[in-house]
């Protein structure tokens, strides 16, 4: 069962990637920068599309909602996803969760970590942590009142608005990311951050292998009876 679930997740992600690539290739050259593709859609949407070349796919609605500084922050965030190959980490986390639902918190932790990684990169590029925080918050709020995102963006996108609660301990990823950007920056090293994400992904791979072996053992036990 675990193996079947993993296959389904892989096929779904592959279809989303193929759809997104076709869409981006058709619109290539209609962007605001060399690696940016603008989709004529009023949805609030932006995501990094990995590959050779990698693209930043952004909706016209998103661009209209941000000023020039906000767009700079957005593009810096998405370029961090492309440069860091963050899709590899998130894919491993999601496959691990598909094989074993108990690992869903692990997948969410990986998603949040790569978003924070990209946030900090955008803050360094712009030199303005408050700008990045405001851009994230604005995009999340507007996304709640615009049309739903296409399938590819829903799977690959990074804009995941959550309802803000009173306590940040129970808040969704967006409020926590904004709070982290508004707080004084902690001394961090990119190598250590990359190592933390890699270790988390490695844990996911290990869990995936464990799930596979458990499935094999259950099949053997069933055959024995």
Residue positions per predicted region:
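Juxtamembrane boundary at the C-terminal end of a transmembrane helix
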Residues: 207-225
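Hydrophobic core of alpha-helical transmembrane segments in multi-pass integral membrane proteins
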Residues: 1-7, 197-207
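Active-site-proximal gating segments in proteases and membrane effectors
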Residues: 26-51, 127-203
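An active-site-proximal "capping" alpha-helix that borders the catalytic cofactor pocket
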Residues: 112-128
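Active-site recognition of the HExxH zinc-binding catalytic motif
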Residues: 71-86, 118-119
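Active-site scaffold of zinc-dependent metalloenzymes
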Residues: 41-67
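Transmembrane alpha-helices and immediately adjacent membrane-cytoplasm interface residues
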Residues: 1-25
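Post-HEXXH active-site segment of zinc metalloproteases
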Residues: 85-107, 111, 115
């Amino acid at each position: 069962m675990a193996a079947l679930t993993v296959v389904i997740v892989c096929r779904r992600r592959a279809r989303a990637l193929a759809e997104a690539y076709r869409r981006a290739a058709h619109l290539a050259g209609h962007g605001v920068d060399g690696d940016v593709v603008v989709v004529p859609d009023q949805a609030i949407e932006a995501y990094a599309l990995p590959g050779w070349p990698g693209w930043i796919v952004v909706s016209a609605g998103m661009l209209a909602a941000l000023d020039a500084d906000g767009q700079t922050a957005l593009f810096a965030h998405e370029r961090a996803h492309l440069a860091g190959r963050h899709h590899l980490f998130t894919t491993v986390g999601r496959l691990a969760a598909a094989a074993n639902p108990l690992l869903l918190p692990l997948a969410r932790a990986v998603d949040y970590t790569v978003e924070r990684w990209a946030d900090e990169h955008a803050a360094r590029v712009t030199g303005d942590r408050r700008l990045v925080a405001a851009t994230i918050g604005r995009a999340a709020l507007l996304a709640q009142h615009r049309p739903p995102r296409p399938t590819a963006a829903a799977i690959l996108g990074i804009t995941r608005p959550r309802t803000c609660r009173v306590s940040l301990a129970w808040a969704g990823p967006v409020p926590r990311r904004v709070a982290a950007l508004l707080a004084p920056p902690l001394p961090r090293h990119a190598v250590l951050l990359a190592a933390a994400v890699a270790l988390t992904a490695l844990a996911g791979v290990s869990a995936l292998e464990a799930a596979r072996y458990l499935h094999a053992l259950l099949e053997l036990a069933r055959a024995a009876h």
